[in-house]
């Protein structure tokens, strides 16, 4: 009887361990290739929150990336989200909200921890030597966009929906948004940052955020193609995969997949009126057009009357004016900055936002009380005044004492921007 009980206990304990492992916020496993190497699979595993990034998830991803970087058996990595709704719908901002009390210090310790880990992860991904393959199926927003931007090979599907909707919560397009929005063609990135417009997979390809259009049912075939690739071509006698060759192998395998027919790109259709709108003058001039239906129709009737545009414009009109001012300022401020300088600057802005009223008010209205009626602290006219501009510029100032900035070591002997970044 004792032996039977012991055996039963062992089985139950094993099941408990397996259940706990499957409940981890990020899952890691490997797939063997036909020629004896391994493909690492990283799965964001919080589908109930649409795989929103937490501090723990950033830490787990960073640790595993470091471990697999030095593992010669690992030739490429795949990053995906659990469930069929989202890859990653942003950051877990509820804990940030809880930390934003009226007597919280500047800089806020939790905001420092959250944004510090998040931005270090993005930097690590951008400079990662091995192929990072993004399975960009479903919703991708905020922090998920930062992960997307950091991957070397990005796949999108007919279900891909991406946005930088921070204007609705009083933050700003963070998560390296200032970096990748600036690099979109025809000032479409500025439009997306100001309006939080929702885009699709074809838009992602046009905006330099993705390279491959596939269907959501192609995942298994893609993994199989990667497993069957000839990784020995890039392996040395020490069984170490050459990273450049590995990138080429992944590119060939993905390019060989059937190209899916995705929904038409709104950015491709309307890039000209978007560019005209964003080039109409300063933020005040852009605002005049965005606030006036007749002015938008005069700019381009089809653009103005498209439900996609109308949703974007409505989001802007109800969004946070301070966010709009920060978005516009950052878009022009980062033009000549390196990725690391942009992340460093964004970390400053993020911590200031956590100390100022609009971010907390936006989260309250959207996620806590859910009344969707935020009371913003300033109008856009206030933001454009001399006092308002000083307030906006204060967000860029380093709020940390000397040596305490979470990304401060990036300003050491190695000059920012000196590394090759994708």
Regions found by a protein language model. Give the residues of each.
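Charge-dense, extended regions
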Residues: 369, 379-422
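Conserved CoA-thioester-binding segment of acyl-CoA-metabolizing enzymes
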Residues: 1-80, 414-422
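Contiguous mid-protein beta-loop-alpha structural module that forms a pocket-lining wall or clamp
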Residues: 176-240
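Glycine-rich beta-to-alpha active-site loop
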Residues: 125-169, 191-192, 196-197, 201, ...
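A structural preference for short, pocket-lining loop segments at secondary-structure junctions
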Residues: 37, 42-45, 60-105, 120, ...
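Hydrophobic/aromatic residues within transmembrane alpha-helices
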Residues: 79, 92, 147-148, 203-204, ...
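Substrate-recognition/cap regions that form aromatic- and gly/pro-loop-enriched pockets
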Residues: 286-364, 370
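Amphipathic alpha-helical blocks and their helix-capping loop/short-beta junctions
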Residues: 215-315
């Amino acid at each position: 009887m004792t032996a039977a009980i012991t055996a039963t206990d062992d089985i139950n304990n094993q099941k408990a361990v397996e259940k706990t492992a499957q409940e981890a916020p990020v899952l890691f496993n490997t797939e063997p290739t036909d020629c004896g190497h391994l493909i690492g699979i990283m799965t964001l595993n919080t589908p109930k929150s649409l795989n929103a990034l937490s501090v723990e998830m950033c830490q787990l991803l960073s640790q595993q990336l470091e471990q697999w970087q030095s593992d010669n058996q690992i030739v490429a990595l795949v990053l995906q989200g659990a469930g069929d709704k989202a890859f990653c719908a942003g950051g877990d901002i509820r804990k940030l909200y809880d930390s934003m009390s009226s007597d919280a210090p500047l800089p806020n310790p939790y905001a420092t921890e959250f944004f510090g880990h998040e931005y270090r992860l993005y930097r690590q991904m951008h400079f990662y030597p091995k192929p990072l393959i993004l399975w960009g199926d479903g919703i991708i927003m905020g922090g998920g966009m930062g992960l997307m931007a950091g991957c070397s090979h990005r796949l999108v599907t007919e279900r891909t929906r991406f946005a930088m909707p921070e204007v609705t919560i009083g933050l700003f397009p963070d998560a390296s948004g200032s970096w990748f929005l600036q690099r979109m063609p025809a000032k479409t990135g500025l439009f997306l940052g100001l309006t939080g417009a929702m885009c699709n997979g074809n838009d992602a390809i046009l905006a330099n955020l993705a390279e491959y259009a596939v269907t959501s049912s192609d995942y298994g075939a893609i993994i199989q193609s990667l497993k069957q690739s000839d990784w020995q071509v890039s392996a040395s006698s020490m069984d170490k995969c050459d990273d450049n060759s590995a990138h080429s192998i992944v590119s060939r395998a993905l390019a060989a997949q059937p190209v899916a027919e995705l929904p038409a790109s709104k950015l491709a259709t309307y890039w000209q009126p978007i560019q005209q709108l964003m080039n109409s003058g300063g933020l005040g001039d852009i605002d005049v057009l965005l606030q006036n239906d007749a002015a938008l129709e005069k700019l381009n009737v089809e653009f103005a009357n498209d439900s996609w545009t109308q949703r974007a414009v409505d989001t802007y009109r109800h969004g946070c004016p301070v966010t709009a001012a920060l978005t516009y300022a950052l878009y022009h401020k980062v033009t000549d900055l390196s990725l690391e300088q942009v992340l460093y600057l964004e970390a400053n802005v993020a911590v200031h936002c956590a100390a100022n009223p609009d971010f907390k008010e936006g989260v309250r209205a959207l996620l806590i009380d859910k009344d969707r009626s935020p009371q913003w602290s300033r109008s856009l006219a206030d933001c454009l005044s001399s006092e308002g501009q000083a307030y906006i510029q204060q967000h860029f100032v380093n709020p940390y004492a000397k040596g305490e900035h979470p990304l401060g070591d990036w300003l050491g002997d190695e000059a920012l921007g000196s590394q090759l970044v994708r």
